[in-house]
Amino acid sequence: DDVIITAMNASADTGVAGGTSTALPSGQKTATSDQSDGLTIAKLRSAKYILDNNDVDPSLKRFLVCGPKQVQDLLATTEVTSSDFNTIKALAMGSIDSFLGFQFIMSTRLNKDATHTTDRLTFAFTEDAIKLAIGKDVTAKISERADKSYSTQVYYCMDLGATRMEEEKVVQIPCHE
């Protein structure tokens, strides 16, 4: 998860040889940092507008990765919890599955803004916006070390990386915590 989350906000190496560093453009952010409010319906609508305005195919699955505090912020709004606006009984379930076309993914691994540490950076993105590459799959070995009184030694490794493929399909949403 950390590799994918980092790829959403980090500079992406682009170009034929990957020699150009491309930051997430400011137009792909719903608001500036130093927010005074958490995740709101207005911020969700803004993220949807940014994706729609970029001509992102509406048939692509859209996701929103956010933390527990952002879920709590939305559970306090009528639009999310009322059956008049949402077919899922979010308040009864205590979670949000989907809203405004976004499927919600709750994660405690999201970073805070480096400058404004009271802001959690959440992201809206499409299913093809981030690519994960696995160079070497998981290798795990457990053995004993005779030179260490036959202590158990655990070896575990894998090689992977992720990057943004299309900036216009990722939206950063800073939320106050």
For each predicted feature, which ranges?
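Alpha-helical scaffold segments that mediate packing/assembly in large oligomeric complexes
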Residues: D1-N53, Q172-E177
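Long, contiguous amphipathic alpha-helices that act as assembly "spine/axial" helices in icosahedral shell
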Residues: D1-T20, D55-P68, F104, A140-R164
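Detector for Asparagine
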Residues: N9, N53-N54, N86, N111
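Short, catalytically relevant binding-site loops at active-site mouths
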Residues: D13, K69-D73, L110-K112
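Sequence/fold signature of self-assembling virion shell proteins
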Residues: P25, T32-L39, T77-E177
